[in-house]
Regions:
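Generic N-terminal amphipathic, Lys/Arg-enriched alpha-helix
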Residues: 1-23
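Short, surface-exposed alpha-helical recognition segments that flank or form part
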Residues: 5, 20-27, 91-94, 194
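A short, well-structured juxtamembrane/interface segment
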Residues: 24-41, 103
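Glycine-rich phosphate-binding loops that contact phosphosugars or nucleotide phosphates
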Residues: 48-207
Length: 251
């Protein structure tokens, strides 16, 4: 191990992953941002879904200061973060066949919308079926996953496929299988997961690309401001009223 303290080691590992995203995923980030900008310009709606801790990155996009107001959370009860007790139930729900179809049937998603599906492993039934079913509806799907899982783990979907196999675009988070960056001789398991910070940064890079792409086309991006700065509340009220038919968290 490095002579640096564990905190420094973890931060160095996270920085290394972020640099890899910047250098290796630049084209995919640009394509994803353009896809979202196209969706906004064409009157579509934006949605984000993640199960378990992957939901944290999805939630970070919704009703976010500096973020796109049109991004809505596609919530599945029991799998949004750790909102269910006992917590392992959420992991079990990710493996239930047919749950994704039931969710989409009761959601406002329609052809012409865009859906970000965030799943670190991309191997469970829920994200795989979510991507398959959404594309069948005519929804553009961007998958955010660690591609390494497809070569180092077995799919838990009956098709034997992974999230990455059913997307219009894939963003590879580069996270190692197991999601732990550090080891120690006195600790029997690897520790210090980096997927949340890295995936959130990856998605904010996509949002920044989408906003600037819209601006370059002469379209004001529908951005929210912080409610804790003067004028922020009034600004957000105006934006949400203007796009009220494409925002579902305000009702």
């Amino acid at each position: 191990m490095s002579d640096r303290a564990p905190a420094g080691q973890f931060i160095d590992a996270a920085i290394g992953l972020l640099r890899r995203l910047r250098d290796e995923e630049a084209d995919s980030i640009a394509a994803a941002g353009t896809l979202l900008a196209d969706t906004v310009a064409d009157g579509g709606r934006l949605f984000a879904f993640g199960a378990g801790h992957s939901s944290l990155a999805a939630q970070d996009l919704v009703y976010r200061a500096g973020g796109l107001a049109l991004m809505n959370l596609l919530a599945v009860p029991g799998v949004v973060g750790v909102d269910v007790m006992p917590a392992p139930l959420g992991s079990a729900l990710e493996r239930v066949d047919g749950l994704a179809s039931a969710v989409l049937d009761s959601s406002p998603l329609r052809a012409g919308d865009a859906l970000l599906i965030i799943s670190l492993s991309g191997r469970n039934a829920l994200p795989v079926e979510m991507a398959m079913s959404a594309r069948a509806l005519g929804v553009k799907v961007i998958g955010v996953t660690s591609v390494a899982y497809a070569s180092e783990t077995k799919s838990r979907h009956a098709s034997g496929t992974y999230l990455k196999d059913h997307c219009d675009l894939v963003l590879d988070s580069k996270i190692a299988v197991g999601d732990a960056e550090l080891t120690h001789d006195g600790i029997p398991a690897p520790f210090a997961p980096a997927s949340t910070v890295v995936t959130s940064a990856l998605l904010q890079a996509v949002m920044a690309t989408a906003a600037t792409t819209l601006a370059d086309r002469g379209i004001e991006p529908p951005l929210l401001r912080s409610g804790n700065v003067d004028g922020g509340h009034d600004w957000n009220a105006r934006v949400m009223e203007q796009y009220r038919d494409r925002i579902f968290y305000r009702h």
